[in-house]
C-alpha cells in the first residue's frame, strides 16, 4: 500500500482493483493506467484451430487449463450426468489434486480426462478442440460493496488469456448483483457463459447457436488478451509519468 501511495504513476490490473486501492491511498490525481500483469506474448496466439470434439461424439467437452478451482467432485459427477466432459491439464495440478481426481473419477466414470501440461505455443491447437473453458468458480458475497470484496472478486484469472488464445467461451458462476471483475469483463465483451447451477450450465452449453456466437466473440476480442496489444499504451503511460515529474535544468 505504501508503494502505491508514494508512486509517481500507478498501474492496476482492472478498474475494480483501482477503485479498491483508492479507498485507502486517497490521492487520486496521479497518473494511472489499467493493464493486466499476466498478459502473454501475441506470438502464442496462432490461427491453428482444431475441430471440435463435440462435432464427432455429440457430447460437450470442457477444459480446465489448471487447477479445477471451485469445482467439487460431485460437480464433475453432475456434469457427467449431462454428458459434459471435463479435461484437466497440468502434471503438477494432477499430482497436487490426486485425492480430488480419485473422488471425481468415482462419480464421473469416463467423463474426466487427464492431460499433461500444455506449452503456450500449443494453446490454440490443443484447447480449441473444446467447447468451453473453466475460470474460477466461487460465490461472491460482497453485495456490490468494495470493502467486502475479496481477491476472487477483484482478480482476473491468468487462464483467461489461455482460453482467449484458443477462442474458448469462459465458464464462470453467475454472481449478478455483486462486484466481480472477471464477470464484468465477460459481460462487456460477450465472451463467456455465466451460470447459476449445473443444469443451467448444461442447457446453455447445448444451445449450439448461442455458444457459437460466444466463441466468435472470444476470437474477435482475443488480441486484447496479449501484451503486444497494449505495449504502446504502456510506453505512452511511462512517458506521461516521466513528463509529470520532469525537473527543468537551469540554463
Regions from the language model: what does each represent?
Residues 8-9, 132, 169, 191:
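Well-ordered beta-strand positions
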Residues 6-8, 83, 130:
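Short, well-ordered alpha-helix to beta-strand connector turns
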Residues 196-246:
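A charged, aromatic-enriched C-terminal amphipathic alpha-helix characteristic of glycosyltransferases
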Residues 16, 37-38:
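Carbohydrate-associated surface elements
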